[in-house]
Amino acid sequence: MRDDRERGEGDLSWPLIGEKSSVKEEVKKQLWLSGPLIAVSLLQFCLQVISVMFVGHLGSLPLSAASIATSFASVTGFSFLMGTASALDTLCGQAYGAKKYGMLGIQMQRAMFVLTLASIPLSIIWANTEHLLVFFGQNKSIATLAGSYAKFMIPSIFAYGLLQCFNRFLQAQNNVFPVVFCSGVTTSLHVLLCWVLVFKSGLGFQGAALANSISYWLNVVLLFCYVKFSPSCSLTWTGFSKEALRDILPFLRLAVPSALMVCLEMWSFELLVLLSGLLPNPVLETSVLSICLNTSGTMWMIPFGLSGAASTRISNELGAGNPKVAKLAVRVVICIAVAESIVIGSVLILIRNIWGLAYSSELEVVSYVASMMPILALGNFLDSLQCVLSGVARGCGWQKIGAIINLGSYYLVGVPSGLLLAFHFHVGGRGLWLGIICALVVQVFGLGLVTIFTNWDEEAKKATNRIESSSSVKDFAVDDRSVVVF
């Protein structure tokens, strides 16, 4: 047993007293990573929120249309691109740990190529937003405006895919502060841009969508300039290379499950709001569920940052052949997630009677939101655990296993449970959210079991094999003739 522990196999028991210094060091590394990643998530999330806020001053109809178009864009485009790009958490993270620095730029270029191609059919879907919304029963006037808004957002889908690639590329190198800076500059300028395009240009609500596109592209340009000219990226970015066009299929084998992991989860939450419209008193139920979803989404930024830190630390250590340190990183991030979720959950419960006032002055809505807050607190606890465990999965390259667990959790357990509670037992919107709680329990249990019984020595070997097989050039000395310096 003692030998197994020394080799880093399976056991995830908590650190011994003698390991306190390494635990402290690991906590510092993860907080140093997760803090900026949380800030980046919030700043990029604010981009869409700011646009919708400006549109809200034009009237309720444009506001409804912009909100629906934004939600439609998230479901049909942004979630897929974010999930696909998360394959770089594994590939770039492990390559950086193995000191195969040239591979990071190649892997990012592969991802850029794939995501740009994927954006073409997604943009066609966005161009037909109006027809699709009408087909699914949306009000014609809202669908028309939403379709117009989505068309002006089409350039943003190409930028968003590239932006995700740059984010993961720099994150894998533990170089996240430039991402925070560029996101901060972009979001600050976005406020001015929205004001000009919405109120001064004559574009009206379409100006907000165009502002999204411009801001995303501005962020991409800023990050590209940093990557190209910064000395910190001189080893990982050596210019565009034809090598990136090889081995696309191995990349897709990891990218497709990565996309499914994210999409299956995000789609279930959007389905929650759609189903709330079928309940008795749909206006109240939809309003309250939207408030809960917005609150939950904002709180989710914290465990999402921890998840990014976990995937980076674990992939780096596995790539470097340090299974024991990778296992320690898992222990530490789980402890941080538990502590964070207890604090956030306590705050949610303490403010339950006043939180609804931030969204509505109607007492019925405020009272309903107050009754939902303890459920949200429980959901936040479970969501924090599943987030960091999903980060562990990405760091190890378990995206296929994660996609299977997410499929079973949300669509075999969560959605059916929510439907049963909401419509058969007449629990209403609480029942739909309790269905998500059931899904999170199964998801945490499944990912937790996989993590607990992991042979970390074996994972380190798999990382080495993945790095060696990801390019036909084993030592990755890229031929100068295959590189275009730009």
From Swiss-Prot:
GO terms for biological process: response to nematode; xenobiotic detoxification by transmembrane export across the plasma membrane. Its main location: membrane. It is a multi-pass membrane protein. It is found in: Membrane. One of its GO terms (molecular function) is antiporter activity. CDD domains: MATE_eukaryotic. The chain crosses the membrane at residues 35-55, 68-88, 117-137, 142-162, 179-199, 207-227, 259-279, 288-308, 331-351, 365-385, 401-421, 433-453. It holds the Pfam family MatE. Keywords: Membrane, Transmembrane, Transmembrane helix, Transport. It comes from the Eukaryota. GO terms for cellular component: membrane; plant-type vacuole; plastid. NCBIfam families: matE. Belongs to the multi antimicrobial extrusion (MATE) (TC 2.A.66.1) family. This is Protein DETOXIFICATION 16. It comes from Arabidopsis thaliana.
